[in-house]
Amino acid sequence: ETLMSDRPGRDPRWPKKRSGFAAFALTEPDAGSDAGACRTTADKTPDGSEYILNGRKCFITNACYADFMCVVASVDRSLGYKGLTMFLVDAHLPGVSIGKHEDKMGIRQSATCDVIFEDVHIPASALIGKEGEGFKIAMKTLEQGRASVGSACVGIMRAILEEAAKYA
């Protein structure tokens, strides 16, 4: 169902996932591969019912098509990576916008874009896992995704070799 849903199969946040398009928003312009340097913030409202999301993500695959995004943001920047938290964010909420589209050399069948969050109100129920678990969740997600990319590359290379052998 998901890597870190705390209520798999019963979680009311996830039905849309089955028919919508998703994006994983971790990388930032000033953080690069250092996820712990995340500057996107999620400030909890005084009554605790919402978080206000502000920041910018870059190199986000298929962000311009996404119906929702798994977004990593800091709830406490003084904690570094231990303050990172993941949220399920509706990509059509007010304050969510798509920025620059990258002109890539390879893997051009998927779009890669910036995503800007400006005072985006998200419900506290949008939390994936718990506050402070965002770094762990993101790393597990990347671990699984990287294995999939490696597998896909092996399959692509096999097909290339088979096609090349036809002409040899």
Stretch-by-stretch model annotation:
Residues 1-28, 46-51:
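FAD-binding glycine-rich core of flavoenzymes that anchor FAD
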Residues 1-10, 61-68, 80, 147, ...:
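Internal helix-loop-helix
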Residues 22, 36-38, 67, 94, ...:
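Short beta-strand or tight-loop elements
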Residues 31-32, 58-64, 107, 144-149:
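Glycine-rich phosphate/pyrophosphate-binding beta-alpha loops
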Residues 34-36, 62-66, 80-83, 108-110, ...:
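Short glycine/proline-enriched turns and hinge-like loops at secondary-structure junctions
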Residues 40-43:
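A structural signal for short hydrophobic beta-strand segments in well-ordered beta-sheet cores
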Residues 50-98:
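A short core secondary-structure module
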Residues 96-168:
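Glycine-rich beta->alpha junctions and the first turn(s) of the following alpha-helix
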